[in-house]
Amino acid sequence: MDVPKLLEAASLLVPAEIASENDITINDVWDYLAHDEWEVALGLLEELGDVHPLPLDFWESLATAAEQMRLERSAAWCHWRCYEARNGIIRADLALRPASENRRRTPFSGAGVLRPMWNIGNRTPTGEDDLNIALLWVEFIPTLGPGERASVRLAPLDPSQWRHLQPGHTITMHEDRTIGGTAVIVEVQGPMATPAP
């Protein structure tokens, strides 16, 4: 399917009554599509998808369109949102420890490439901390470095291990056995789509 058709298909899944913080509506998207402004339309659709939960098909169409336009970060974000539609959303405020107290010395990309371990309160059969792995997406900034703080989204490798988390819970991030950062859960939502068997 070509880019305009993918964007049109995604647009049809957006309720007419929703608007972004900047009062962007689906009518604005249709105007940009009519003028072949596909990249702008894609960005507006991503923004509308952050306002109101939209189905997996919406994010899959946007991911394919972004890939065809070679917009790597947009494609990565839309694939991330596909994961969230299937498995749920976990958002947190993360504070990394300073370089003097942490293994990490340099910033990392915020685009969902870091896969740290997390202490989320689970225990091994012998009572030791059981660390769980989750990809990390940093919101609103491209990188995050030692001593910095940001809003993040987490994509657990095994979402069932994370179901007990609630807003207000504190979890710790580990790139080795030492604590690299502390996060406070701010949002937990269930999946929009039924996971594939």
Q: Which residue stretches match the model-derived regions?
A:
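C-terminal effector/interaction modules appended to NTPase cores
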Residues: 85-197
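C-terminal-biased regions
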Residues: 1-88
